Amino acid sequence: KYSGPAVMINPEWMQEYDEVVGDKGSLIFPVALVKELFAGFMEDPDFSANVGRMVHGEQLMRFHAPLAPWDLVAPRAEILAIEDKASGQILNVGQKIMREGQVVVELESRLFFRGEDDAPKKGEKKAPKPEVDRGAPSSSSSTTIADDLPMRYSGPSGDDNPIHTDLDFAKSVGFKNVILQGLCTMAVSAGNLPKDLKEISVRFTKPVLPGDTLTTSVWENGN
């Protein structure tokens, strides 16, 4: 288990995050409060990992109460599981943001550490996943990722992994360009969601690059 120092939520910090992701009062801001914890266990000598080969696999957020400027919070984390896969390892990390002894936000992150030989072999293609026919969406919106968004997001989020900010490094680990932070992809995609949402869960299936266009489609299910 890992405990981070108490964090005061500066309103300018929240505003900077919102401006970068283009969403006032972004639901995803709490992810920025746990970055010190990630830095802590990544540097733990008992946990050996090549951060340069890490990508975000899945993210869950559960909201118990809203955060406000000048809140003093205490982030906590624990490693829930480490799974070995043919193409690498998955690290499952649970996190909690505490305020006055109460859980305000729960998070769960599944991080995928790509193996050294995870690229498809020549002529090898992954089978496409079947599309689910949901009918026409109730609404949709599109955003084109600016060239400098990975760099700008690295500031307020604290996610400055060089695969997001250093082109040469990104190429050295197999990407053709820097890639957008998974949590930035999540924040941009979640921009039209209601602020009283109780839970959000996402799965990242492929990297998002500067210049890509993200389209968020929403289907109402009657609930």
Where would I find each of the regions flagged by the language model?
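Hot-dog-fold acyl-thioester-processing enzymes
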Residues: 1-58, 118-125, 130-194
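Hydrophobic residues on conserved beta-strands that form the core of alpha/beta folds
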Residues: 4, 106, 197-199
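Short, surface-exposed helix-loop/turn micro-motifs enriched in polar/charged residues
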Residues: 25, 87-89, 196-200
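HotDog/MaoC-like acyl-thioester-processing domains
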Residues: 58-145, 204-210, 215-223
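Beta-strand-rich recognition/accessory modules
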Residues: 186, 192-193, 199-200, 204-212
